[in-house]
Amino acid sequence: MVIPHIICLPMALHLWTCRFLSLGRPATNRRNCRRLRRRAVHRQATRPTRRIHHSAPQSFPQGLFNCAFVLLRRHALCRRLVGISTHVRAFKNCSKSDGPRRHKRTGQNSRVCPCGSWIYRIVSDRSGAFKCARRRVL
């Protein structure tokens, strides 16, 4: 009598976790995420971003934790692409950010932050200092 409970309980927990995590992703974010990913690959300007498109690393254990990890990672990807403005401050303080870089296709000055895979356009204000402005894709 114990064996069915051992099998059914993790399965029920697995399904509940998947459903619970998928409720946090609005449909518009998912649609925008797909559209942005298509455009990003088309522009060929997202070399750092391609790393986060993988669903899960190969060494990650399969099962409940894998499902939760994939959904959380997808949710983070959509939120990152659709836009969170608070990362602008974190980008300015990031020690890993490299200098201005020219895009292959657009030719615009841009700066890439490898830690968060964000792409910014370098905008010069009147004082001559450079600040980072997030590119609007939508």
UniProtKB/Swiss-Prot annotation:
Residues 1-18 form the signal peptide. Transmembrane segments: none annotated. GO terms for cellular component: extracellular region; host cell nucleus. Keywords: Glycoprotein, Host nucleus, Secreted, Signal, Virulence. Glycans are attached at residue 93. A motif (RxLR) lies at residues 34-37. It comes from the Eukaryota. It is found in: Secreted; Host nucleus. Secreted effector that completely suppresses the host cell death induced by cell death-inducing proteins. Has the canonical translocation RxLR motif, but lacks the canonical EER motif, which characterizes most oomycete effectors identified so far. Belongs to the RxLR effector family. This is Secreted RxLR effector protein 91. It comes from Plasmopara viticola. The gene is RXLR91.
